[in-house]
Each structure stands twice: as structure tokens, then as C-alpha cells.
Amino acid sequence: MPPPAADAPCPEQAFNATALKWHTCAWLLLPVLVFLAGWMHWYAALPLTLLTAAGLAPRKRKEPQKKNSLPSFPLFTRSSFFVLAAFAALMIFSGWGEWVNQHPDHIVRNACLRELVSSPWPVIFPDGNVLIYNTGFWLVPALAGKLAGLDAARVLVVLWGTWGLFLSWLWLCVFSGRRSLLLALLMAAFGSLLNLQCWLGLNLFRLHYFGTAEQIMCSANASIPVLLFFIFLASGRMPLY
């Protein structure tokens, strides 16, 4: 059977949505588990970890019979690898990994990763102050950095963000019912209406907000988890389920 086109119709079962859900839960929850283990006493971390595991435990439910379902096809096709590579390039050229010129916001981001890699957890500075920041995005890469060094942590930051973007794209495909490269482009390029307003020379009220690409450049640590969570949530509300 010839492989489907890049925008071939794609119901949930064609993605092996169970595996996709587990990948998404792992991406969202692994930093939480690392935080529980690294920042909290065991008598607080253990019950919270057990509660998290209980919430993820599969439950038996009656599944509606599916009719006329299309045969599943491999997820990792050439088009999928192209999207994965494009997201990796987006992360790298946005400054993550510290290999290209960075937005000034990365001064704080880089320092956060270095402290998480080099300092014991929880991070307490010599003057008694503690590291208070939205550190979740860096925790898994920083844990790898403690084992393999800061360079390994930088590489994993890029890979971690790339995988989060890739999962977001997959859930967009589930949401729309099609595996489409255009969805990846729209997701990455979705931006402010202020650009259109400026191009047309309209002196109206400001329609500005930070687009996806700008958010990834400045704050992928905050924007990618939110993007993935809400696309995942919206996809779960589709009539397909």
C-alpha cells in the first residue's frame, strides 16, 4: 500500500493515540516528578508521587464501537521527520542551546540552567537566598547535565523543547483529523494582528500579542508547556472521542 500524503485524513486511532497520550503526560509530568524528588522531603514527595500515579492509572470504560475506521499508518514518515527537524531548527535559531545569538531574556535562562546543573537541589545561594523561578522546563535537561555535564544539558534543552512542539503538532493533527505540514507552519507562525495593521498603515487600537515564534524565542520554557497542554485539552473535547 503506498504511503499516505502529508495531509492524509488521520483519525485518532491512526496515531496510536494511547501512546501519544502517554508521551504527552510524560512530557508534562516528568519535570513535576523531578521537582518532587529534588526539592521536597521524601515524606511529602512520596504521597504526591503516588497521587500522581493514581491519577494516571488506566480505568476500564466502555468504548463506543468504531465504524468505517481508516487503516492506521506509520507516524514517523518523511513528513513527520521534516517537521521534527524544523522544530529543532526553530529551537536552535531561537537561541536555545547557546549556539547562536540570543535574545537578552536568555541571560536569565542560561543562568538558571547553569545553577540547576552545578548546584545541589534545592538551589540555595551562599547568602541564604533560594532559586525561585519557573524551573520546570529545565529540570529534566539539568538532571542529565548533572550526570553528563552542562553541554549535555544544553543539547537536551533543545531536544526537550523540540519534542514538546512535535507533540503539540500531533495533537493539532488529531484535532483537525488530518496530518498536515501546514498545521506545523501555522502553529509556529501564528502571530499578532498588529503586523497586518502596520502593513496597511491603519492607525487603530493596538492588536499586539506575542506570536508563537516570538514566544519560543523569548520564553519557550513557559510557552511550549502551555501550548501543548491546551491543544491536548482541546483535542480531547472533539466529537471523535
Segments from the language model and where they lie:
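Structural signal for the C-terminal ends of transmembrane alpha-helices
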Residues: 37-39, 53-67, 93, 173-177, ...
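Membrane-embedded, hydrophobic transmembrane alpha-helices
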Residues: 1-70, 188-194, 198-202, 206, ...
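Hydrophobic, membrane-inserted alpha-helices
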Residues: 26-35, 86, 138-145, 166-167, ...
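Alpha-helical transmembrane segments of integral membrane proteins
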Residues: 21-26, 78-85, 183-184, 221, ...
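Active-site lumenal/periplasmic loops and adjacent helix-entry segments of GT-C-fold
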Residues: 93-228
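Membrane-interfacial entry segments at the cytosolic side of transmembrane helices
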Residues: 68-76, 178-181
